[in-house]
Amino acid sequence: MKILQYKSIENVQYSKNILYFCGHSMGLQPKSTKIYINKILNQWKNLGVLSYHYGELPASYCDEQLSIDCAQWIVNAKFNEVSITCNLTVNMHVLIAKFYRPTNEKYCILIENDIFPSDYYVLESHIQWHGYNTNDCFIKLKPRLHEYCLRNDDILPEIIKNQHRIALIWLPGIQYITGQLFNMKLITEWGHQYAKCPVGWDLAHAVGNIPLYLHDWNIDMAVWCSYKYLNGSPGAIGGLFIHEKHHHEEGSYGPKFIEFTNNNNITIFNNINGPQLTGWWSHRSETRFNMTGNMELAKGANAYRLSNPPLLLAAALTVSVNIIKSCGGMINLREKSIKLTDYLEYLITNSSLALKHDHYCLVTPSNSNERGAQLTISVTHMNIQVVYENLLKLGVICDYRLPNFLRITPIPLYNSFEDVYLLAKCLHQVLNDTLN
């Protein structure tokens, strides 16, 4: 990122070279994105309604190749298990509506204590939808005293202890504050073996960050956004995964339901074949425009789409996914990512630019197998907003979360080792020199 104008930001009245380390919150715009979007805009301009079915990226099908590419290059799944559609929260609602099937005995959802608020709101709404009390339905995993991250040794006992009550497990692939990478394969196995329940994952901070193997890990479902590590633009189109073992039978004509009554004597109709919630784009494309009013579900994950994908957002994400393909996929990017984050950790902990131990605490696990690209530090003896603003004045863009967490992420697609070194110098200046 060469130049960024700060003139709209209070107290910063100059332009300079920027050190951008905030890809965990918003990825940068690829150089070719504007060119490609303008090309697609011209397609709409020149073809009008015909652009639904013709042109380089027909609007009605703009998600199809994108879904295939994301399945192959980003999450390692079968093509029929991935759909690029809607956004993370909507996709989560659609999948939770299918997989959260509370009964009198099993009605609880296992989550982390510091779950991302949006995910909490989704789960809370489904608990209430089924007529249950939220206070009775959440089992929360908490780190040990004076620790930031969850230990596998503490997750398994909690699953075993509550296996008779757990109806669903929902966790993040990578925790948004600490940057901790969860062992998705192992935890999914535990959920299946002991709680005998579906296990779902929020991959907002994992997709485009680390290699994923969703099919092979036997994950039931997952959702993600695309504006962070995938650089898909603000409010980018999201994605969902549903393992093929949960797919409805081919030729299924709409949802099939069973009726049961929960412990509050409320009658619930649950879909046992395909999505619980459907829409215009859940219908198979071959007969969608016959307008019969009879739902004919699309195959696999495509049945979990709701409406026509946004063409321009699909175009923006197409550019970004093609860049990842040109790099050889996530394994190559991860190799550089590990080196960048390891280098940053070395600089702030053991080099001549090391931060004083009483000025910070490293929150993210030091083991590269237990983290993604993000490195989070807890700042002591200084207001975190002041730290953020002082870094901003030096041209460093990262972000913070209250009460005192500074989140920094070297991105292999656009950060260099020199960037990381210059960042460490700025951190040293702000944290060490200011507090001396």
Curated annotation (Swiss-Prot):
One of its GO terms (biological process) is 'de novo' NAD biosynthetic process from L-tryptophan. InterPro entries: Aminotrans_V_dom, Kynureninase, PyrdxlP-dep_Trfase, PyrdxlP-dep_Trfase_major, PyrdxlP-dep_Trfase_small. Signal peptide: none annotated. Its cofactor is pyridoxal 5'-phosphate. Coiled coil: none annotated. Pyridoxal 5'-phosphate binds at L88, T89, F116, P117, S118, D119, D202, H205, Y227, W280, N308. Its main location: cytoplasm. It comes from the Eukaryota. The modification N6-(pyridoxal phosphate)lysine is found at K228. Keywords: Cytoplasm, Hydrolase, Pyridine nucleotide biosynthesis, Pyridoxal phosphate. One of its GO terms (molecular function) is pyridoxal phosphate binding. Its EC number is 3.7.1.3. GO terms for cellular component: cytoplasm. It is an enzyme of class 3 (hydrolase). It catalyses: L-kynurenine + H2O = anthranilate + L-alanine + H(+); 3-hydroxy-L-kynurenine + H2O = 3-hydroxyanthranilate + L-alanine + H(+). It is found in: Cytoplasm. Pathway: Amino-acid degradation; L-kynurenine degradation; L-alanine and anthranilate from L-kynurenine: step 1/1; Cofactor biosynthesis; NAD(+) biosynthesis; quinolinate from L-kynurenine: step 2/3. Homodimer. Belongs to the kynureninase family. Catalyzes the cleavage of L-kynurenine (L-Kyn) and L-3-hydroxykynurenine (L-3OHKyn) into anthranilic acid (AA) and 3-hydroxyanthranilic acid (3-OHAA), respectively. NCBIfam families: kynureninase. This is Kynureninase.
